[in-house]
C-alpha cells in the first residue's frame, strides 16, 4: 500500500477455500498441493514444515527418535491437512505416519500456541515456528525426516481483463517471497529452493479484493 497509495485492499482471512466467483474475490493465497483445476494459480514459494514440541512436553513424555514413534505421542493436528496422517520423506522414500491426539483445530496458530505450552507435538509451517524455535520455546524433532512440502499459490479466476491493481499485487507478492530476508532464512533452514521472482526470493487462505 505504501508503493501504491491509491490502491485499497479488502483482506479476509479464513481456513476454508471459498468460491472466488461467488464471493467476488479477486485473488486468494493458498497453501496447498491440491488446487482446483478451474482456477489459475501462480506458485509463489514453497512452504516447509517442522515437527516440534516444547521442552516441557519432551521432558514429561520423552523425545520421539523415529517418525513411527509419533504414534505413542499426543499429536495436535490441523483439521484440513494431516489430521490423522503425516507425510514425510526419509532417505529418499515416502513415509506416511498415523497420528492422533486430544486437540485438533482449523487454525495452525492455535496449535502452535498449545504446542508451546507443552500440550503435545505438532506439525507447523517453518516460517511461523522459526521465532519460537530460535527462542528455545519449541524444539525441532525428527531431523532425518522431511515433512511434505506445500506450495504457496496466488489463485485467481482469469487472466483476461486483469485489473492493473491486481497485476501489481501479483508482481509484488512474487517479489516479496523472492527477496524478504525472513522468508529466505526460513527457506534456507529447511533446504527449500528460493521462489521464482526478481531480486536476490485444505488449505490456509488469504484473499483480497483490490480497488
PLM ranges: what are they?
Residues 126-135, 145-211:
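C-terminal effector-binding regulatory domain of bacterial HTH transcription factors
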Residues 1-40, 188-190, 194, 209-211:
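Central regulatory/effector-binding core of bacterial HTH transcription factors
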Residues 112-137:
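A ligand-binding cleft/hinge motif common to bilobed small-molecule-binding domains
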Residues 15, 31-34, 53-55, 124-127:
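Beta->alpha turn/N-cap motifs
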Residues 41-44, 135-147:
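Short beta-strand->loop
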Residues 27-30, 120-124, 140-141:
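Paired acidic/hydrophobic, glycine-rich loop segments that form the ligand-binding mouth/hinge
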Residues 38-49, 53-76, 91:
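Flexible hinge/capping segments at coil-to-helix
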Residues 9-13, 77, 97-107, 145:
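Short beta-strand-to-loop elements that line the ligand-binding cleft
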Amino acid at each position: 500500500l505504501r508503493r501504491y497509495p491509491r490502491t485499497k485492499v479488502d483482506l479476509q482471512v479464513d481456513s476454508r477455500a471459498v468460491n472466488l466467483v461467488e464471493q467476488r474475490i479477486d485473488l486468494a493465497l493458498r497453501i496447498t498441493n491440491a488446487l482446483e483445476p478451474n482456477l489459475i494459480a501462480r506458485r509463489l514459494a514453497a512452504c516447509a514444515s517442522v515437527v516440534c514440541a516444547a521442552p516441557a512436553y519432551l521432558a514429561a513424555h520423552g523425545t520421539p527418535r523415529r517418525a513411527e514413534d509419533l504414534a505413542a505421542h499426543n499429536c495436535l493436528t490441523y483439521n484440513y491437512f494431516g489430521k490423522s496422517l503425516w507425510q514425510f520423506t526419509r532417505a529418499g522414500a515416502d513415509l506416511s505416519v498415523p497420528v492422533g491426539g486430544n486437540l485438533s483445530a482449523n487454525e495452525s496458530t492455535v496449535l502452535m500456541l498449545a504446542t508451546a505450552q507443552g500440550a503435545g507435538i505438532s506439525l507447523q509451517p517453518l516460517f511461523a515456528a522459526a521465532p519460537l524455535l530460535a527462542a528455545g520455546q519449541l524444539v525441532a524433532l525428527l531431523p532425518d525426516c522431511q515433512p511434505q512440502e506445500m506450495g504457496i499459490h496466488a489463485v485467481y479466476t482469469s487472466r483476461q481483463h486483469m485489473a492493473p491493481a491486481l497485476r501489481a499485487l501479483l508482481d509484488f507478492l512474487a517479489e516479496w517471497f523472492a527477496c524478504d530476508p525472513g522468508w529466505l532464512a526460513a527457506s534456507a533452514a529447511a533446504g527449500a529452493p528460493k521462489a521464482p521472482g526478481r531480486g536476490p526470493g485444505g488449505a490456509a487462505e488469504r484473499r483480497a479484493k483490490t480497488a
